[in-house]
């Protein structure tokens, strides 16, 4: 492909990927299969690898990249990001409405009523249609510049969709973590023995303040845009018009925004969302009222802290009393024992709550929770049931203090509590409960993502002794699957196909799937990038592991202990024999990989590789592709009809390899 053809194709791919990103992340209406989308992205990555000069800051491939930063820079907002005054009841709303109408000499007023998202306020600055800066609200006048982290949020456009955008525009929105993503994040953190986030807002805030954008990208954040802070080239008459324009430009604007002209309509809307809010996939803690006409907003003005033309109505937090009927123990995939309170069913925040995790023995003792206690509960972030504390004044004397068992409730093995940790663990690596949850973890969405292998199927496979470890999944037959309940021939074929397709998963997914204690998705990716293969990771010593950024002594110990066990090494060997991918599927970290330090030049036309594909394969293994031959070049890969690079390589005595030898080089490296 000629350079001008590559440039045109790269721009075509960017536009196509942006279109599908908008359909998926903003409109929630995809029109393309995941596999086809992935193919487009891979083609663009390959082109930009082969032609680095084609990479642009707003390319979809540049959402996550660069080294972790050392800190955050403070920047000034073009217009202050003021906080909103609060209203907590009907009287407060009536006072606000009266002040507005008095300030406008009883003119007609329309209110835009928006959901009040419980997240992190940010500003996004676009210059000539391209995202150049993102910042937190901070103190309203200045905030922290977090552009690399905000770029990882797929629903934030890197460039505006419609032509004619102003030279400079600063828009405002609320970054949030969806309920499902929050629940999964805390589950993974609990499994890995990490502190839990109290609510989605804290999780979103912590994710945005990561020095490494790669961590932010893994947290599944999203955003709703709610206004324009500054623009130098476009004028709106109403706030609702500005919201419509933002939607046309590709931003996510919440569909539940409404316009009302009377306070009675507003109050009915507030009552509707008092219960309906719990059905949303994200957390809201109230609604926001804004005067719609911008000329009226200007006349009403602002105080030092907040605009006079807007107010935030906040719902009171929901709490309930119930009784602890029992405390049971759950054994996780790493062997950690998690106590769970069985509660008398009670209605709370839109659902019936009957259980709440107590996390560990220390927390039970700290909150003085006993079996039979009356306790006060709420939902952390309107999602996760949490016991706030007991009500000692309501005790009858029949309550029973809880004591952690000394043996595993599943296999009767001895329990251990590692020094310096709050968790208690089953010492038996073959514990049935650990095995079941290890399998469920292995096939989960963030691990090997094998559709159709849910809890019911896993349980049957274990009961019939068809699997004893994750590697056995790859030897299942059609006959064995058809013999399971509710698995017909078609379902069996689909399941076998999903299992076979999962063999091509990345090395990072494989490492995460193994369930190594303290090794989450982020650590798995870092280890995959550093060592390039599962064999390389297994051979690594303590110093090599701790030399990886963010991999401290705790994770290093876990990795060493995991691969020191004969049983785990046998599982890995079975996975290799089954054909599971065990090498890095992405460029190795700088200075690592089998081709680390090797420089390649490509010349001529290859039969089985495009130039972009060959470059990508070299980069995946840690090598480097350059355009000019020099004495520092290690290999010149020779295709048909080579140019002057071949002559220069001969003159300089550089090692020249033809396509068959190049293929042998790649296959030899990837077979270890």
Curated annotation (Swiss-Prot):
Keywords: DNA damage, DNA repair, DNA replication, Ligase, Magnesium, Manganese, Metal-binding, NAD, Zinc
Assigned EC number: 6.5.1.2
Domain of life: Bacteria
Cofactors named for this entry: Mg(2+); Mn(2+)
CDD domains registered for this protein in UniProt: BRCT_DNA_ligase_like, LIGANc
Pfam family, one: DNA_ligase_OB
Domain BRCT residue range list: 590-672
Gene Ontology annotations for the cellular component aspect, listed alphabetically: cytosol
EC top class, as a word: ligase
Any one Gene Ontology BP term: DNA replication
Catalytic residues (positions): 116
Molecular-function annotations in GO: DNA binding; DNA ligase (NAD+) activity; metal ion binding
Residues that coordinate or bind NAD(+): 34-38, 83-84, 114, 137, 174, 290, 314
PROSITE patterns the record matches: BRCT (PS50172), DNA_LIGASE_N1 (PS01055), DNA_LIGASE_N2 (PS01056)
Entry binding sites for Zn(2+): 408, 411, 426, 431
Listed InterPro entries: BRCT_dom (IPR001357), BRCT_dom_sf (IPR036420), DisA/LigA_HHH (IPR041663), DNA_ligase (IPR001679), DNA_ligase_AS (IPR018239), DNA_ligase_CS (IPR033136), DNAligase_adenylation (IPR013839), DNAligase_N (IPR013840)
Annotated catalysed reactions: NAD(+) + (deoxyribonucleotide)n-3'-hydroxyl + 5'-phospho-(deoxyribonucleotide)m = (deoxyribonucleotide)n+m + AMP + beta-nicotinamide D-nucleotide
Function: DNA ligase that catalyzes the formation of phosphodiester linkages between 5'-phosphoryl and 3'-hydroxyl groups in double-stranded DNA using NAD as a coenzyme and as the energy source for the reaction. It is essential for DNA replication and repair of damaged DNA.
Family statement drawn from the similarity comment of this UniProt entry: Belongs to the NAD-dependent DNA ligase family. LigA subfamily.
UniProt-recorded name of the protein: DNA ligase
Upper lineage: Bacteria, Bacillati, Bacillota, Clostridia, Thermoanaerobacterales
